[in-house]
């Protein structure tokens, strides 16, 4: 998002403060069919090739900085499933490259990638005193009629009944271990 409307409201002297929210769900969507396409689009936005976990994190940090410049103070994450297994940077880099190559990932690899990136993001939110919102366990796009009319993620979701407490605890603990747990 180029945040042009947020900038325009500010420039026009709109009296009510309208601040952006940072929502990097697509950067975490390594299990989605359009993940490589999104990474290519993000590469265009930042102006360099994103071909490793290091360059992905660099790009995400740049986007966080951009959103912060426009007044962002909150991140928002839609997490559909269990979300954390500890992994090394080398493991996560290999998983990222595997996904970019179009190879199928295991459930464990998806959790390792998402958990690693969430911990990274959490540390940056903490540094900026941002709030990190986590929407866990949503059943998406429940209304076929509205999905066909409006497309995905248009507000027709509901709560799922998955168990996520242990992995959520592990994720928050990983962020807190280095005293980098953002407000959640």
Where are these predicted regions, by residue range?
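Phosphate-/polyanion-interacting regions in eukaryotic proteins
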Residues: 10-14, 21-28
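Short, conserved acidic/polar surface loops in the N-terminal third of protein domains
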Residues: 5, 31-33
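Histidine/acidic residue-rich metal-binding segments in metalloenzymes
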Residues: 2-15, 38-183
